[in-house]
Amino acid sequence: MNEKHPGPLVVSGKLSDGERMKSESNFLRGTIAEDLNNGLTGGFSGDNFLLIRFHGMYQQDDRDIRAERAEQKLEPRHAMMLRCRLPGGIITPQQWLGIDKFAADNTLYGSIRITNRQTFQFHGILKGNVKPAHQLLNELGLDALATANDVNRNVLCTSNPVESALHQEAYEWAKKISEHLLPRTRAYAEIWLDAEKVATTDEEPILGATYLPRKFKTTVVIPPQNDVDLHANDLNFVAVADKGKLIGFNVLVGGGLSIAHGDKNTYPRKASEFGYIPLKHTLAIAEAVVTTQRDWGNRTDRKNAKTKYTLERVGVETFKAEVEKRAGVSFSAIKPYQFTGRGDRIGWVKGVDKKWHLTLFIENGRLLDYPGRSLKTGVAEIAKIHQGDFRLTANQNLIVAGVPEKDKARIEALAREHGLMDDHVTSQRENSMACVSFPTCPLAMAEAERFLPEFVTRVEGILQQHGLADEHIVLRVTGCPNGCGRALLAEVGLVGKAVGRYNLHLGGNREGTRIPRMYRENITADEILLITDQLVGRWAKERHVDEGFGDFVIRAGVIAPVIDSARDFYDVQEAM
């Protein structure tokens, strides 16, 4: 596709089966309540398998033992992954202690997984523990509503502990946007919290009776940090401040990274700039973008249903004009903004409020007690004495925020005692990330979380060998092309193709504003490391001052930049 072809506003044709499922679900109830009482299987069946996603859960099984159980004529060991709704990633120490205990007592793996969407997941909840899990969240003032499926997911907000006043304002907007776009159905409260069924008819004034065509992701971003990776998201509010006070947002729409191997009608896409709005129009614009996508998104093909494809089909200006019409608001010209990076500042920083903030590097976001490194216990011990809050970051790390000077030494001592602070962690490790993948993700094609630590060790060796031990490459591994690991915004991105094999993408940048192009297809880790060694060798010798690896491979002609991904993402580049 070399030209822009505006298409119809609404795609006609046979609706996908997901649309049938939603329309017949009675506003997301299905027969989940009845299925809960079916002790003959450890899983949810039929439509309920997908409907539980609207309630924040995915049905999974342990793929390490799937074949063994099949030989024994047993069904897979079904267990649920439950994802909390936590706009902006802020959680109190008291809430943390509650989830820490639940993970230990009621999950197969005993871990808490911080995700790159600023929340946490429990993995391995057996069917009998699912309802208690939701009830626990409710007791803690939390929920899992709308953290999966065709709704607005967990709203991200830049974790900026230094500009505390600005962060607080941005965080409040993340919460407001999340609440405004939530499903209104009482199904969640009825099924999980035993809320009384009332005779009123459910209505979904924003999402509609069949909800959105596909998942929808929203961020609130405070430049110059792009830690939330705005270009992976459908709707982005980029903070504009005046004298340290939030005055409005630049709005960017239509980002997204998921693709399908072998289907060139799918592609990653950066978000498009729509314009600037003052704060008072934020919720109206959020609602208008969502309802436009609700009505115009492709409901016949789920692989082409996301906002990014709607924008390409109808045209950015047409979509933008419809948003303005529905919101009764005109966008002003974009205000200047710039991103300089997206990594977390590991260690202590002092905020303008004179409080201290400690960012702990949590490799892969997995909190568990390992031999010699009791990470999960360490965070719980800090929670017992911490007077501020915890902030989960989009880089899967944890910030102990709002520490007064008098508590600083004690919290650092606990962090060091439990292996949560390690002065030997390299910049490379801190800038590497993977999705969960095997053994729990049903979509996994290749290892990611379990693969990353040793792979990073080998990359560290390459950097050291070329005299770049203090440097880093933004490295991401995602176990399948759905892209949860956000590899398609990395300088070096690995996308799982098959067990032990990945597509290697090069040429993103450190700021997360360029999509990397595929350099080699379906290759092994050893082959990737060989290529990395050769290219890092050139980078060490030929780089400009402060030139990142991704910028270097573009400038050196190793790979051509992706300029317009809907048209050039799959262009074959001859390797140099």
UniProtKB/Swiss-Prot annotation:
Q: Which family does it belong to?
A: Belongs to the nitrite and sulfite reductase 4Fe-4S domain family.
Which cofactors must be present for this protein to function? siroheme; [4Fe-4S] cluster
**From what superkingdom does this record's organism come?**
Bacteria
Gene Ontology biological-process entries: cysteine biosynthetic process; hydrogen sulfide biosynthetic process; sulfate assimilation
Q: What is this protein called?
A: Sulfite reductase [NADPH] hemoprotein beta-component
Give the keywords, sorted: 4Fe-4S, Amino-acid biosynthesis, Cysteine biosynthesis, Heme, Iron, Iron-sulfur, Metal-binding, NADP, Oxidoreductase
Kindly give the HAMAP family that the UniProt entry links to this protein: CysI
Q: In which pathway does it act?
A: Sulfur metabolism; hydrogen sulfide biosynthesis; hydrogen sulfide from sulfite (NADPH route): step 1/1
Q: Where does siroheme bind?
A: 484
- Spell out the Pfam families in the cross-references: NIR_SIR, NIR_SIR_ferr
Question: Record-annotated residues binding [4Fe-4S] cluster?
Answer: 435, 441, 480, 484
**Described purpose of this protein according to its UniProt entry:** Component of the sulfite reductase complex that catalyzes the 6-electron reduction of sulfite to sulfide. This is one of several activities required for the biosynthesis of L-cysteine from sulfate.
Cofactor annotation comment: Binds 1 siroheme per subunit.
Ranges annotated as spanning the membrane: none
A GO molecular function annotation here is: 4 iron, 4 sulfur cluster binding
